[in-house]
Amino acid sequence: MALLCAREKSTDFGQIRNGLRGEPELVVYSSSQAHSSITKAALLAGFGKSQLRSCAVTDEFAVDLADLRRQLDNDVADNRKPCAIVACTGTTATTAMDDIKGLADLAQEYGCWLHVDAAMAGSAMILPEMRHLWDGVERADSIVFNPHKWLGVVFDCSIYYVRDEQHLVRVMSTNPSYLQTSADGEAPNYRDWGIPLGRRFRAMKLWWLLRCEGADKLQNRLRRDIENARWLEQQLAEQADWHLIAPVALQTLCVVHRPAAIAESELDAYTQAWCESINASGEAMLTPAVVGGTSVVRISIGALATERRHVEQLWRTMQKHTA
């Protein structure tokens, strides 16, 4: 939805009238660490892969603003039109946090729609001490995050915020005679805010969680997960052969075990092997990933029932399977 709105805003809603013909070539920008759903959404919105730009990242795996500006300038020089910038807070592999303020400045300068993909990490916006990670988010055109990923809502539940709902209405509105009623106009008609004509009552799940647990309990659970991640980070730091590949922004750690007996050329296969060994044992579930060209193991601490004793057991399990 965000990219459909971005497409129409960039063309003064011209593609609604004329389809994909007769308009400048539009371009979408995101970091190389952006979720695969960004590419899928762009393709569904009518962009071709040649219209997608994957920007370099910093040493902390956030988008490199200088490289983004370079790509924006190159496209403008080639008579292409910058359409949308996607900010990731945080990225799937490492939970890296893009600089929203910097991206908002570029979006304003180049006339782009700014979409913030807060997916899992967006739940941490309920913590006052973590809100600095989203500085500038009030300047976004749209934001999405998934309460089913960390907040604890039953799957599936995604929240989509848009600055101006009229962009949704302009893109999605339909009003055939068989849908018209005497009450039209008295309240928002959500068939005009999205692709489906009808929708399930997903909001009930979120409402029920908020009523049952309340803000304080939800905040304390997220703080517990972050504290447990910090504890494990400290254990890893005290061992010479364990390494963190990325900063620990919230509750996700990307680790590599580098024993002296394993050659560098064999390290990726070794990493995948001990990750698969733990998963096969049923003692824990970890996720392999590739970060900066290196195979890593992702440890995401965020299940509802996960306590310190479980993380302590995980650490013992990791040591056992790499002994």
Which positions does each model-derived feature cover?
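Conserved PLP-enzyme active-site core in the AAT-like
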Residues: 3-169
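Conserved PLP-binding catalytic core of the aspartate aminotransferase-like
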Residues: 244-278
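Short, glycine-/Ser/Thr-/acidic-enriched flexible segments
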Residues: 33-35, 59-60, 90-92, 121, ...
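Anion (oxyanion) recognition and catalysis
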Residues: 104, 108, 237, 278-279
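Short Gly/Ser/Thr- and Asp/Glu-enriched loop/turn motifs at secondary-structure junctions
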Residues: 23, 246-251, 290-296
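PLP-dependent enzyme catalytic core of the Aspartate aminotransferase-like
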Residues: 110, 288-323
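Active-site C-terminal subdomain of aminotransferase-like
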Residues: 91, 110, 135-240
